[in-house]
């Protein structure tokens, strides 16, 4: 006998086959499971023996509720998950772009039992320790790009050719090459420290400086402007790219 958790979609957020609902759409007929059905279903599932509900929203036709990309708002499933908690005695967990500060508030208030964090752990393996030790400014944030963890990278119209039978394809990160590939991209301390000049302070230049520093070298970036970031300063200008900044 062991505890059994169910990943439970509270509401389907689906308008028709292949047509998911967006966050701003509230006046539509639910094609899948609505809240009234969900309130009954969670009780049936509890009676069937499930011990915990790890909750989000959505279906394959509205996948972006369960795995929110950068276009979705933070805590997008919170309202629905907190509502369904009222209808079960099992622990209820909320997933989906959970802000850690908001998550802590809701758990402390008893409106949630826990939150589920996945992608943030791929980009920064020490993020929870940094929060606990008051080092939030050191956290490398997930930008919700899905290019590494979901194998969705595109280049000039060509899909990522990474084989889907690769067991690691959902455990990689576009921002952290060492995630599940630490043997391939292991950062090895140098035995011959050098002072290294890096021309350009864009994303590539900054990452180069970071790795060189971690290896024990002394990197120096030469940037022609008074800002680091290069073209990514423009690329991250949209309001929904707050973590890119």
What annotation goes with each model-predicted range?
Residues 1-199, 203-214, 218-219:
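Flavin-dependent oxidoreductase catalytic cores
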Residues 217-233:
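Glycine-rich FAD pyrophosphate-binding loop
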Residues 234-245:
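N-terminal glycine-rich dinucleotide-binding loop that anchors FAD/FMN and/or NAD(P) in oxidoreductases
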């Amino acid at each position: 006998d062991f505890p059994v958790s169910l990943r439970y979609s509270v509401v389907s957020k689906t308008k028709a086959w292949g047509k998911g609902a967006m966050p701003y759409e509230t006046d539509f007929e639910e094609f899948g499971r609505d809240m009234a059905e969900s309130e009954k279903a969670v009780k049936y599932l509890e009676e069937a023996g499930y011990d915990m509900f790890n909750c989000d929203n959505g279906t394959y036709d509205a996948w972006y509720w369960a795995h929110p990309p950068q276009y979705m708002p933070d805590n997008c499933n919170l309202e629905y998950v907190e509502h369904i908690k009222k209808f079960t005695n099992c622990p209820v967990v909320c997933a989906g772009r959970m802000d850690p500060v908001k998550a802590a508030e809701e758990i402390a208030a008893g409106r949630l039992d826990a939150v589920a964090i996945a992608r943030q752990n791929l980009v920064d393996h020490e993020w929870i320790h940094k929060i606990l030790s008051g080092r939030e400014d050191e956290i490398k944030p997930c930008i919700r790009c899905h290019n590494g963890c979901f194998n969705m990278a595109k280049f000039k119209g060509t899909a990522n050719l990474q084989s889907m039978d690769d067991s690691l394809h959902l455990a990689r990160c576009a921002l952290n090459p060492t995630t599940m590939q630490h043997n391939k991209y292991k950062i090895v301390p140098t035995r011959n420290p050098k002072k290294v000049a890096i021309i350009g302070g864009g994303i590539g230049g900054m990452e180069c400086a970071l790795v060189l520093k971690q290896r024990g070298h002394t990197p120096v970036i030469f940037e022609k402007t008074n800002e680091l970031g290069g073209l990514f300063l423009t690329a991250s200008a949209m309001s929904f790219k707050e973590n890119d900044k």
